[in-house]
Amino acid sequence: MDLDHIITSKQLSRADIETVLDRAAEIDADPSAFADRYENTVLGLLFFEPSTRTKMSFDTAMKRLGGDIVDMGSVDSSSVKKGETLADTVRVIEGYADALVLRHPNQGAAQMASEFVDVPLLNAGDGAGHHPTQTLLDLYTIRENAGLEDLTIGIMGDLKYGRTVHSLSRALTNFDVDQHFISPESLQLPRDVVYDLEQESGTRVREHDSFEDVLPELDILYVTRIQRERFPDENEYQKVAGEYQLTATHLEAAKDDLTIMHPLPRVDEIAPEIDDTDHAAYFEQAHNGVPVRMALLDLVLSADGGVDDE
């Protein structure tokens, strides 16, 4: 794996993905073997948007590797409030850190920022663009529950603005899976994502406006929330809010071994009654963020002159 920055899942080959997932499995099996590998190594966290799981799991991952973090904190308490540009911010903070993690509301921000720094930069979400590290933990969760071959996967919810969807759907083209996309017409996959899937990867894009008909076929159902904060018009959000609500009754038509995933946070798209069923994997999915991000940091930092891979 030879990547200076992790910006989109399109960068990642099947071999790259398997390298990260295999390393994550090693960490899961024996975390102590990776403790203190990166003593005196510092990870810079630059989050221009709210985050719970991504930010805390990167923080935990770096500390469990023996390193530490520097955190820009909220935008309101940083020099961004004074008008500092993103380019200047990352140039300054790379002087304090050995790698950077960036979340930003603007699509393309991570790519732009990476052009101004020499340390590795990992995209933790750029608006409605990409979220490649979430994709890696999603793939790890899928592999742990169902393998990554000969699967039928449904992806449901906000497919237009959902960066987790854009990244995951592209990464899945590296594996033998059928993908079904379930959304209101107004929230269908962006045409550039459809182009990547169909024209560049040869993936058939199957679009549905209801999940009931396709549910019995699915091995994995990946649910996303309707993202209120991405809508330019509140009235447009209200038209689709609550469009899909998965309940235990729906699961009577599903396969016994269906795995239900969600990048979280959820609103009302998965009923709490599903949480304690064998289908629910979304909390496991969130917890997988730590070993997967430990694996990614280990591989990126070692490639950048840290600990050599054995």
Swiss-Prot record:
Record's catalysed reaction(s)? carbamoyl phosphate + L-aspartate = N-carbamoyl-L-aspartate + phosphate + H(+)
Q: In which pathway does it act?
A: Pyrimidine metabolism; UMP biosynthesis via de novo pathway; (S)-dihydroorotate from bicarbonate: step 2/3
Keywords in UniProt for this one? Plasmid, Pyrimidine biosynthesis, Transferase
Q: Supply one GO CC term from the record.
A: cytoplasm
Q: What is its EC number?
A: 2.1.3.2
Q: Is the Transferase keyword given for this protein?
A: yes
Q: What is this protein identified as?
A: Aspartate carbamoyltransferase catalytic subunit
Organism expressing this protein natively: Halobacterium salinarum (strain ATCC 700922 / JCM 11081 / NRC-1)
Q: What is the primary gene name for this protein?
A: pyrB
